[in-house]
Design a protein with these regions (language model features):
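Basic, glycine/lysine-rich polyanion-binding surfaces/domains
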Residues: 1-228
Length: 228
């Protein structure tokens, strides 16, 4: 029931089963990795320090989101874009078309799982290295820490716990976009500007003109709200 789900969110002793799902991750690495991502994505990648993360998106020319992701800068020239509801293979193949002469390699990061950890003291926006991957905190109604990890034993997922996890995303206003909804919603419609994931002053990127026009002139007719 909804009451049980809410109780699971706020009782510290209840946690989502360790292995949440296979993690869909696009890896961008190379000398030009940061510059390439900065030119393609609507978030300010140049402002992302090493071992930090931010929410980002890749827009089409009409300012509609192809995908929404968590971008981790795990090394100076290595980025991981975790797609909570997207296809890494699709996004990597599409991004590869824009590499041209950039010194960058775009690929699907294989073998990673998303794991729910005990809440940690990691500062918001920071990434901590772990023996099998990286961990960071996500916003929600209660503290929660996740780990992008290799070599995780698959576990049977509890439907109620997964529902609690999804509800936490909704309550935090995280607009994870399923691949079937790609290129249907503008950055403002998804609330990416509210999350600081759609920059107005970083320079040109696909869809930047639309993002700026909707911000300064208005005209956006959609917005994400939580109604219950």
């Amino acid at each position: 029931s909804t009451h049980v789900v809410h109780q699971a969110l706020f009782r510290a002793e209840i946690h989502v089963p360790k292995s949440l799902a296979k993690a869909e991750i696009v890896e961008i690495r190379g000398e030009d990795a940061v510059a390439f991502a900065h030119a393609q994505f609507c978030n300010d990648v140049l402002a992302l320090s090493e071992l930090n993360w931010q929410i980002g998106a890749w827009l089409d020319a009409q300012g509609r989101a192809r995908c929404v992701f968590v971008l981790l800068r795990v090394e100076a020239n290595r980025l991981l874009a975790w797609l909570p509801m997207g296809s890494a293979a699709t996004v990597a193949a599409d991004l590869q078309r824009f590499v041209l002469r950039a010194k960058v390699k775009v690929s699907v990061a294989q073998g990673f799982h998303l794991v729910e950890d005990e809440p940690t003291q990691i500062e918001n926006g920071q990434v901590a290295e772990s023996p099998d991957g990286w961990r960071f905190n996500l916003p929600g109604p209660a503290p929660r820490s996740v780990r992008v990890a290799r070599h995780v034993e698959p576990q049977t997922l509890d439907a109620g716990a997964l529902e609690a996890w999804r509800l936490a995303n909704v309550m935090a206003g995280l607009p994870w976009l399923h691949e079937s909804l790609a290129c249907q919603f503008t950055a403002q419609a998804l609330g990416l500007d509210r999350l600081g994931a759609a920059s107005l002053d970083k320079g040109c990127y696909p869809g930047q003109e639309i993002v700026a026009r909707l911000h300064f002139r208005g005209g956006n007719k959609r917005i994400c709200v939580r109604v219950q």
